Amino acid sequence: MKQKLIKKNMFLFFLMAPLLLLAQDVVKGKVTDSSLGDPLPGVNVVIKGTTTGTTTDFDGNYELSVDNFPSILVFSSLGYASKEMQVSGPSTLNVALDESATGLEEVVVTGLATSVKRSNAANAVASVSADELTGRTPPQTLDGALAGKFAGAQITAASGAPGGGMSVKLRGVTSINGQGQPLYIIDGVYVNNNSVYAGGLNEISNAAGGGASSTDSQDNASNRIADINPDDIQNIEILKGASASAIYGSRAAAGVIIITTKKGKAGKTKINVSQALGWNEAVNLLGQRNWTAALAESVYGEGALYTAAESAGRLRDYEKVIYGEKGFITNTNLSISGGGEKTSFFGSFTNNEEDGIVKRTGASKQSLRLNVDHRITDDIKLSLTGNYLKSSADRGFFNNDNSNTTIGVSLLFTRPWDYLLPDADGNYPDHPANSSNQIHTRDVMTNNESVSRLIAGGALDVNLFRNENQSLKMILKAGVDTYTLKTTVFFPRELQFMSPAVGGVDGLSSDGTTQNADANFSGFLVHNFRTDNELSFTTQAGVTNEQFSQNTVRVTSTGLIASEQNVDQAANVKVDQFRLEQEDAGFFVQEEVNYQDKIVGTLGIRGDKSSNNGDANKLFYYPKASLAANIHNFDFWNIEAMNQLKLRAAYGEAGNFAPNGALFTTYINSLISGNVGIITPATLGDPSIQPERQKEFEIGLDAGFFNNKVTLEFTWYNKKVEDLILQADNEPSSGYTFRWANAGALENKGAEIGLNVNAFDSENFSWDSGIIWFRNRSEITELTVASFDTQGFGTGLGTFRIEEGKSATQIVGNDENGNVVALGDAEPDFQMSFNNNFKYKDFTLSFFWHWKKGGDNVNLSRLLSDFGNTSADYDKMNLDPSGTLNNGDYRKSAFGGGFADPFVEDASYLKLREIGLYYNLPENALQKLFNGNVSNVKVGLSGHNIINIFDYNSYDPEVSNFGSTAAGIGIEVAPFPSSKRFMFHLSIGL
């Protein structure tokens, strides 16, 4: 009996032993957000020194088998500081992660298929959080909201009108004629940021020769990234160097801006409603000349008219009449998010409306978004994102004008005694001193741009294999960005400058439509392997394919019948069309080696081919390499005050394909003796042109002091661009004036510094501050063609010139002796920003200053006001060295003599870019007022550009007539002035 009992117990022991052992080596728990207490799904939980790990489910729960104790578990998630926790045995371990927008332990996206801790990244990666982007005040556009918030970017507006275009340059000029703006990627979708000029305003203003090109940079178009709703964004990461952006292909030659939108979290469904109301007003006005009857008589012989207008109370400041409006602003946002065990979602609807500071101008935008994440199994995850956008913008009639017809130019020729208002019957008088009555133009013309857009994408993550030392993952991504852009331009025949008697076209109506479709597909394999001595290898390989097409059709009619707006009701009808189809494909391979987080090295190569090459199947190869050394992780490190020190170096190459049309010769249709035919263009294409090749080397250090209370980042870079694609003179006997050729090289050198200080952090009060400083210097290091001008209006006024040994953004002009000399440079001496955040109990105060030191503009607005004899400083005597001429006559004399120096001005500024003051209702008040049904209530007020300090003699040194060009920003011709904004806010969370 006793033996039977022993045998029975032994049988039960061996039966239960595996279960007992299984129960003994499990560590489980929950991961939450430290500030909100919400569960965090998708957090990586890995046993340090191995590849063994798991991810939290949609409730933030995890369960991990651990073979050996004690062990260290590493918890990491995008947007949060990583945390390491030691476990000495089977247990329940709950962990709270802190959000980290600037910490060195933040996880950042640096590859097509992988992410890395910031402390291990060998490249300078800038990050902008949702709070930094929209937390102070709602921005007009996404790209405009980035100004001054990270090092290395020069951002310039093409118009101050709501919805106007912007230019973003990272680390200087990347190309003269090719792509000069960064690639934008939203949740894995390559989005289109082209400026499409389909309006036809040049037909009226005769700017750029009155051309009707869909690529004419003077037609005041907006960048399409302006469509994106900033309130949907969770985080933005900026890859500025070729070593980081190389694997994204040739579209990323000018850098990459990676945008991650908000996601849902498991748990209670959350609803948030926010409303912002406010107004805008002009940043600065030029003012008017100090007119008197005697002065009016002296200049125009119209002293009696001045006196009569003065007696009748009809002296008007027409600048305030045009730019004196206070535009109403409303931003409404509704979001809902939540999820269950396997599925989470985020949805939002936004409606933004903003009137301009000029009557009948403004912009509106509606956005509808849905993001869904679903874990099909423990090893398969599907992510879907969709965003429908609809926008409309009315931007008036401004910028460059060769016929004195735009509102801005006409205003500069207007005297206070001129009577321009309509009579009782609605009839407008002609302008007595100009070819256009700007009040009439403002009240009846149309310049509308509307967009309907869909951005959608999906990603499938599949864990193919995993054991203690290695894993293999497959990632598939696809995205589409398609939009229809419609432009409507209408100038009725009743306008003064439309009369054929003065050379007008008897009314103009223009309808343009652009159909644009971009698609991207990619597939990756990622293999992780870790040896027993904590040496890890991450291998990734993949293929990509991008397809894009554009079809722009514009119908322009003149000689309208009774000002009929339909384009077929006219004496003359002209049709223009521009079509583009392109396909790019590539592959990449990258190997990352990590030794105990002490030394991290990366090698990679990208191969690219494009239908825009002379040989569409030819691959161009672009290597990259980087090395980061975390000195603080070595055993010899014993400086307690300096808890982190990383030294890094990186090198990379990137390509930039030829601009459209450079590889072939485009013939032009024409009537020849009454018959339809074709003629040769002025420029000869060349299918043998090579892509521009960018080679960039950067070094830097990242440091943390006093447990990262103080962090410092420093980067120095050298970016060389070879095989610049330029237009060269051609032999006249060939029949072509110019030819495309690889004919030069340029170089950018610069430095970037970032310093963040958490000065105080107590229960009731906290203060953190940040400073960013950066500068860039460019030089044309080789030029095998003759020096040439890029943008501007000739050396008599100041123009941008490409010249060997000189800056790529130099401004040249004639001196007093007629010699062409350097007069300035659009590149700033440096830029600097100051960011401060204060929190006292339930109040928060945040403000952000932006300082641009140096950099010059060609200011032609002041010259035009001189021609109109209306400049505010016309009668002052502080410009002429001889003391003989007043300022206005001196500038006109300089123009008459071809002397450009008075028109090139320092464009420095100091701006209070953003400020916000908010109050969060405390929890006890919420409980008392709403019985726990409301989770948060926030009220506040904010401002944008409310303090602007500059000596520049015009509306705003930030606004440029050629704002979207790669080289040549900083030319101003009577633009739509920029505005300051004041807002009130209410936000309620359920």
Task: Give names to the regions the model predicted.
Residues M1-L12, A17-R369, H374, K381-L389, ...:
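Short, small/polar-rich motifs associated with maturation and membrane association
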Residues A282, S311-E319, G327-T361, S367-S436, ...:
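Flexible loop and strand-edge segments within Gram-negative outer membrane beta-barrel domains
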Residues W291-R314, S403-H440, F491-S509, S549-Q577, ...:
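Surface-exposed loop/turn segments flanking beta-strands in extracellular/periplasmic regions
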Residues G301, L305, A309, N675-P681, ...:
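Surface-exposed, extracytoplasmic segments of Gram-negative outer-membrane nutrient-acquisition systems
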Residues A308-S337, P492, V502-V600, Y651, ...:
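Outer-membrane beta-barrel transmembrane domain signature of Gram-negative proteins
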Residues E325-E341, F349-N352, Q438-V489, S510-D532, ...:
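Outer-membrane beta-barrel transmembrane strands
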Residues I357-S367, D373, N387-L389, R395-N400, ...:
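Small-side-chain secondary-structure face that scaffolds active or pore-lining regions
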Residues M642, T884-L990:
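Membrane-interface anchoring segments and C-terminal beta-barrel signals
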